[in-house]
C-alpha cells in the first residue's frame, strides 16, 4: 500500500507542477511529513488525505489505492440540499 500511495502522491504533485514546498503552502502539511509520504515512510492521515485530494483534484480513495479512477467524486452542495426542501 505504501508504494501505491507514494507513487500516486508524487505523480499528482508533478502533474500539477508543484514542489513539495508548494504542497506545504497550499495544505499546511509540513514538507518533511509530505516527503515521508512520497517515500513510503508514513501514510497521510485522513485529514491530510482530504486536503491532498482537494489540492490534486482527486479522491481520497485514489490516493489510498482503493480505486484506480483518479477523477474526484462530485462534491455535495449543502446549499442545494437546503433549497430543495
Residue ranges and their predicted role:
Residues 15, 64-85:
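Short, charged recognition helix plus adjacent turn
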Residues 28, 47-62:
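DNA major-groove recognition helix of helix-turn-helix/homeodomain DNA-binding modules
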Residues 10, 21, 50:
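Residues within the helices of the helix-turn-helix
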Residues 13, 24, 53:
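The alpha-helix within a helix-turn-helix
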Residues 7, 17-18, 44-47:
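Residue-level signal for the short linker/turn that defines the boundary of a DNA-recognition helix
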